[in-house]
Structure formats: structure tokens, C-alpha cells
UniProtKB/Swiss-Prot annotation:
NCBIfam families: nagB (TIGR00502). It comes from the Bacteria. This is Glucosamine-6-phosphate deaminase. Belongs to the glucosamine/galactosamine-6-phosphate isomerase family. NagB subfamily. It catalyses: alpha-D-glucosamine 6-phosphate + H2O = beta-D-fructose 6-phosphate + NH4(+). InterPro entries: Glc/Gal-6P_isomerase (IPR006148), Glucosamine6P_isomerase (IPR004547), Glucosamine6P_isomerase_CS (IPR018321), NagB/RpiA_transferase-like (IPR037171).
Amino acid sequence: MKIIRVQDQLEGGKVAFSLLKESLAKGATTLGLATGSTPITFYQELVNSDLDCSALTSINLDEYVGLPVENDQSYDYFMRDQLFNAKPFKESFLPNGLADDLEAEVKRYDQVIAEHPIDFQILGIGRNGHIGFNEPGTSFAEKTHVVDLQASTIEANSRFFASIDDVPKQAISMGIASIMASKMIVLLAFGKEKAAAIKGMVSGPVTEALPASVLQQHDNVVVIIDEAAASELD
């Protein structure tokens, strides 16, 4: 696990984008993408670059269950707004949180990932150590699955909604085994509230109680953090 300390989120986005360019130069064609406030500066770098994404495939980590794609808090909307409207990809996959049969959707998404192995995966980390929507206690063997979101995750995401009652209670998420199958993982974390999770991920025991700790077992992980997120590291 390589740790790169940066001054702020802006620099973090630039460093992540430079790592992406290196991966693309080595033949990467499929990107695993994340949502939320953490990767926004990475997407800004991508949008402002002259990079042609028309031959690339993207696979998103997760999507809320039951949120229409036109809702500005759906991850489908987020990806179009932050990236796809400006940089169309050859193919862009997201879980369908409106599927009538969620179990069939889970199987479909696992098939998508199997057919498009991820070369470069962007991750954030939750305050409770979740990656994607893989909450504490999720099996490391899990592939795509329907998740009941924990209260801490609902609370953390409520700032994006008019009311905490509007936050979806479930999501479809790529599983930990799916994430670990990525050839390279770049995890971004900024801010003091991520410091405890970063400490556990980097130096704590590998435990399903802190999902991100599994990344210690991956042989190509780069962690990009600001000083606040790094503040509990030795």
C-alpha cells in the first residue's frame, strides 16, 4: 500500500489523474468509478484534460435503490453531471436501482464486471471504513449485493438531501471481492473525519468490521490523503 500525502483535495485530484494517465499508457481500458464529494476534483481534472474517453469503459461502484435517475442525488445523475456529459465513454455501467427484480440486477451487474475486468478503480472511504456501500460486517467474499445502509451512512449522506427521511435506505453495491479483483486501486480521503478509518485501513487488523482494511491484501493500492486524513497515522 503506497501512501501519497497531499496538501488538499485539489492536489489529490491532480495526483489521482496522473496515476490514471500512467495506467492508460500501460493499456488500461476499464475504469471503476465512485461518487460523492471525494472524487470530484479527480473528475474535474479529467474533464479539463484533452483525454479522449470514447474507447474507455466505466463501471460504477453503486447506486441507491428506488431513486429515479433524474433525481439529482442519484449516482446516475451525479456521473452525468460530473463527467459523462463532458466526456462520453464507449460504455458506462451503473447498477439499476429501479429494477423490478433486484436479485436479477445483482446477477446482471456481476456479469458486467466479469466481462469488463476493472483496470483502475477509484475509491473513497466512509467514516465507518466502508468502501462502495460495503458496510462493516460485509463478507470479504461478497460480490454485487443489495445493502441496507447503516444509520451512520444515512446520516453522512443526509447533507445532500432536503431531509434525512429522503435518504434511500438501500443501495446496490459492487462487493468487496469485486473491488479486490481490480488491477489497481486508488483510494482518496480528505478531512479529519476520515482519519480514524484511514488509520484502521493502513495499520489496523484486517477485519470485516472495517471493510477498507482488506485493501492491505491487495498488491497495487495507492492511498491519496491530506494531512487531516493522515493525522492519526504514525
